[in-house]
A protein has these predicted regions:
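Gly/Pro-rich active-site capping loops and adjacent beta-alpha segments
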Residues: 103-136, 390-438, 555-602, 616, ...
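Terminal end segments
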Residues: 595-657, 743-888
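N-terminal Sec-pathway targeting helices
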Residues: 32-53
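Second-shell loop/turn segments in exported
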Residues: 104-108, 146-147, 154-170, 476, ...
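Glycine- and hydrophobic-rich flexible loops that cap the catalytic core of alpha/beta enzyme folds
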Residues: 355-387, 391-553, 570-571
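Substrate-recognition/specificity elements adjacent to catalytic centers across diverse enzyme folds
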Residues: 24, 51-52, 59-335, 340, ...
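Hydrophobic alpha-helical segments
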Residues: 448, 510-616, 670-673, 684-693, ...
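Terminal targeting segments of Actinobacterial cell-envelope proteins
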Residues: 1-39
Length: 888
């Protein structure tokens, strides 16, 4: 049987398989990028490719369809102990049945290599700091490799191999064997189209065998993109450089509004709630805001922004998850929902899969389905027969920047100059010369401000003070220590009850997440896992010592004092109100131990979910799967609720300008794709942020428009003469709140006249709020159009927005309304009948652009719809469209 059986020709788009219909007519405006936007590593592709692609249908068919995998029949896979069955449904999702855990993961490795190997290979090159080996002499790739090598992700992953359990090692090894069985005797062009394209630019070697450490290194990338508050920590210090006033900086980082938006947990539900004294600290030292320190901080910021986004970070990265107990559901059993908000690309982040032991027993306990990462065995989010779990980003403060004084090869500790740790790394560049870099570290961690040379970054002011040495910025991060997160993933897969989840959570060290779970016997719960540093109060601190500002590396009082014990991390089972919502808001109110962070999402999204659930319960209606699906795609804007009353109070004399304002008068605050009011309001918000803050902040700290900025503006509305309303560039005029609001209304009317139409009735949110999925290597603007069109699905106009439950975020600082992050998948699990559960992912199962499963879920996802999620043996068999047998 051929290992390359061609797939059925896709419906809809002839290239991607995506349906041409979209929720909103998409017309993508020009893009402007900023530090937090998703970066793309782009390569130049020779004109030969364009000629070849249009030369004839035969070339296209042979070249692009060659890598499509076999989905039915029989394949011999070396290393298997017995036969393995792989059933695929209409979306191509594999459900794998095996006799042993090793065969199960061996088959998962084989199947994921069939579907997604180039994605796996790209990820391992990124996480190992070897991207230039894959794509060639590209400045972005070299910068990414330099920073990743500075972190030492691969080195930490190798150390992690020594601490994970023997069982985990066996599973990782089996997975690697399955991947390598697929790679054996296949040329690069038979594995993925991307290798053929890259081969026109650089020499493409046979892909290296997969190594178990490649899987562990992927966990470092996951932890990096979900690392917590490092952007806020840097932004505080950078904002001080222009504001020179800690009180004004504090205005930009208000306290979490617990009185408006409930934290995840009520302290009354905790067994032994403890109080913690927050150290607020007095005024900033003189060095903060100095040109020399600003230069070092900006260098660190640039370096960290060079790492390609693999999961998602910046505006919109977060998640929704909630669980409702059986007392409020139609089935009488808990129902759980989860939709992680991450960067969106093609292929998507998640790989759906089912992993089933033919006979579930202590020797083979896996019977689980859900969402995995291509490149790592097991299921990261999903359910087994007894328990479902979802993850959201906690945002705990697990990173600190330390401002170090460096002189020659030493750095200052107290009154002594101690040696820096130094190592040399060699970057291999396909088609180019090797590059050697020097990585220097303090006891806190690698010096990141030296990763990108100042000459390349065009820095005018060196980070230098000749008397005490030069400033440097080191990064301490929990994920740069080896841990057992890999053990936790398999423990989640096997967990049967709340105690099992608590034990698994103790192993899940990075990234710090919120776990909500539900059991088939009727319990619901929340567990906070993660390795969270303990920081001591520094009484005479010149900036807060709670981790919200960069810390003085020379003062040992700022050193971490260990970690919060896992048994002290917040946890609750069966809370009195009968549901739990975890959507990145504060875990506990301020002042309740343990201290996790002050930089939460501000809770507008979580509060809306609570309101919708409370309304159902108060009305006496039972919650079912459809209810949960409807909540997931709710598109009511909390921004509008806060701002529209003030906007309608402004008097606009010009009738033309007032036409936009009139749209807001009868608006229901919904952000549907066809809503003219939603489009106008977004333009007002963009202008309001620009008019209010751009004159006060450095470009790197300009407002993204996320939930923190809504909290900031909500507070500013109460003070019409706050200095932030004034434009510092108009020296002889002092602007106030109402002038800024009026100007934002007028400017938004003019903007949409240019961007859409003179007639407000022609405006539509979906025309400018566009999701344009890009391939990470071949999808960028420097790639020839025919190639981009082949690998990038059609743009889709989207509903929703930032801090909306249907969280299709956009970055106001970029000037564009394009979607920057969103629900990377949606799932709802009914513990009363697992076969009633639903799921969907943003693109599809396959990573092959020519596959009908490359983007066949996109239109369904964009419409806010889902697919049935079969789990029982009978339901999986009934849904099956293809059956593949893997034999020893």
């Amino acid at each position: 049987m051929s290992a390359h059986e061609p797939a059925e020709a896709p419906a809809g788009d002839p290239v991607t398989g995506a349906d041409p219909a979209t929720p909103g007519e998409a017309s993508a405006p020009p893009r402007r990028r900023r530090r937090s936007a998703r970066r793309r590593v782009l390569i130049g592709v020779a004109a030969l490719l364009v000629v070849a692609l249009v030369a004839g249908a035969a070339f296209v068919v042979v070249t692009v369809r060659r890598p499509l995998p076999q989905a039915s029949g029989e394949i011999s896979v070396p290393g298997l102990g017995s036969e393995v069955t792989v059933l695929r449904d209409a979306q191509g999702v594999p459900q794998i049945y095996a006799d042993t855990p090793e065969d199960l993961f061996r088959a998962q490795g084989y199947v994921q290599a069939q579907d997604r190997f180039f994605e796996m290979d790209y990820r391992r090159h990124v996480t190992s700091g070897r991207l230039a080996e894959l794509v060639g002499d590209n400045p972005d790739a070299i910068a990414a490799d330099t920073v990743t090598r500075t972190f030492g992700w691969r080195q930490v992953a190798e150390e992690e191999w020594d601490v994970v359990s023997p069982e985990t090692k066996a599973y990782l090894q089996a997975y690697a064997e399955g991947v390598n069985a697929y790679l054996e005797d296949r040329s690069p062009s038979e594995i993925a189209l991307e290798y053929t394209v890259l081969g026109l630019q650089v020499d493409v070697a046979e892909p290296e065998p997969w190594d178990p450490v490649d899987s562990l290194a992927w966990l470092k990338a996951m932890a990096w993109d979900l690392r917590g508050n490092y952007d806020d920590e840097l932004d505080r210090a950078l904002a001080y450089g222009t504001l020179q006033d800690t009180a004004r900086v504090a205005e930009l980082f208000p306290a979490y509004p617990s009185e408006l938006n409930a934290p995840i947990l009520d302290p009354g539900e905790l067994e032994n709630p403890q109080q913690v004294a927050l150290d607020l600290g007095p005024q900033a030292r003189a060095e903060y805001g100095s040109d020399h320190l600003q230069a070092a901080l900006e260098a660190a910021d640039r370096a960290l922004g060079a790492v390609p986004v693999l999961i998602g970070r910046g505006e919109g990265t977060g998640s929704n998850s909630w669980v409702v107990s059986g007392e409020h559901t139609a089935s009488g059993k808990p129902i759980l929902a989860n939709d992680p908000h991450l960067a969106l690309g093609a292929p998507g982040i998640w790989a759906q899969v089912g992993l089933h032991c033919n006979e579930v027993s202590p020797a083979c306990g896996f019977d689980v389905a859900g969402f995995s990462f291509a490149g790592f065995p097991g299921v990261v989010i999903g359910h087994n027969a007894q328990l479902a779990w979802g993850l959201t980003n906690m945002g705990a403060d697990v990173t600190d920047f330390f401002v170090e004084r460096v002189r020659d090869d030493t750095y200052l500790r107290g009154d002594e100059w101690v040696p820096l740790e130094t190592r040399t790394e060699t970057l291999r560049v396909a088609g180019g010369d090797d590059i050697e870099i020097e990585v220097r570290s303090t006891l806190h961690g690698p010096i990141v401000s030296e990763a990108i040379p100042a000459t390349e970054a065009a820095v005018d002011t060196p980070a230098l003070d000749t008397r005490l040495g030069e400033y440097a910025v080191a990064l301490q991060w929990t994920a740069l220590e080896p841990g057992r997160t890999a053990d936790a993933v398999f423990a989640f897969n096997l967990a049967q009850d709340a105690e099992d989840m608590q034990a698994a959570a103790a192993l899940f060290e990075v990234p710090a997440q919120n776990i909500v779970f539900a059991t088939a016997d009727g319990h619901i719960g929340y567990q906070a896992p993660g390795k969270v540093p303990v920081r001591q109060a520094v009484p005479d601190a010149e900036v807060p010592s709670d981790g919200t500002w960069p810390r003085d590396g020379s003062d040992e009082r700022y050193d971490w004092q260990g970690y919060v014990p896992s048994e002290e991390m917040p946890r609750v089972v069966d809370p009195a109100e009968g549901f739990i919502v975890a959507a990145n808001q504060a875990v506990l109110p301020d002042g309740v131990a343990p201290f996790l962070t002050t930089d939460w999402d501000y809770g507008y999204r979580s509060q809306r979910i609570r309101q919708l659930l409370e309304a159902e319960i108060a009305a006496g209606r039972t919650v079912d799967v459809d209810t949960m699906n409807e909540v997931q795609v709710d598109d009511r804007s909390p921004y509008a609720e806060v701002l529209v009353p003030s906007l309608l109070e402004q008097e606009i004399d010009d009738d033309f300008a007032a036409e936009g304002q009139q749209l807001l008068a009868d608006w229901d605050y919904r952000t549907d794709t066809d809503s003219a009011a939603a489009a106008y309001f977004a333009a007002v918000w963009r202008n309001l942020l620009q008019l209010t803050f751009w004159d006060d902040l450095p470009e790197s700290a300009r407002p993204s428009g996320g939930s923190r900025w809504l909290a900031v503006v909500q507070n500013l509305l109460e003070n019409p003469t706050d200095p932030f309303w004034d434009d510092r560039q108009t020296v002889s005029v002092v602007e106030t709140r109402d002038e800024v609001l009026t100007q934002a209304l007028v400017s938004a009317r003019l903007d949409l006249t240019v961007e859409q139409s003179k007639q407000p009735s022609d405006w539509a949110w979906g025309k400018i709020h566009v999701l344009a999925l890009e391939h990470p290597v071949l999808g960028g603007e420097s790639i020839p159009g025919p190639v981009r069109d082949f690998v990038n699905p059609n743009p889709v106009g989207m509903p929703g927005g930032s801090s909306i439950v249907n969280a299709t975020a956009w970055d106001a600082a970029s000037g564009s309304f394009d979607v920057t992050a969103g629900p990377s998948m949606r799932m709802v699990v009914d513990l009363g009948d697992l076969d009633r559960s639903t799921w969907v992912t943003v693109t599809g199962t396959s990573g092959h652009p020519a596959s009908k499963h490359y983007a066949d879920q996109l239109s369904t996802w964009a419409r806010g719809e889902t697919y049935a999620w079969p789990f029982s043996t009978e339901a999986v068999a009934e849904a099956s469209k293809d059956e593949l047998t893997l034999v020893p």
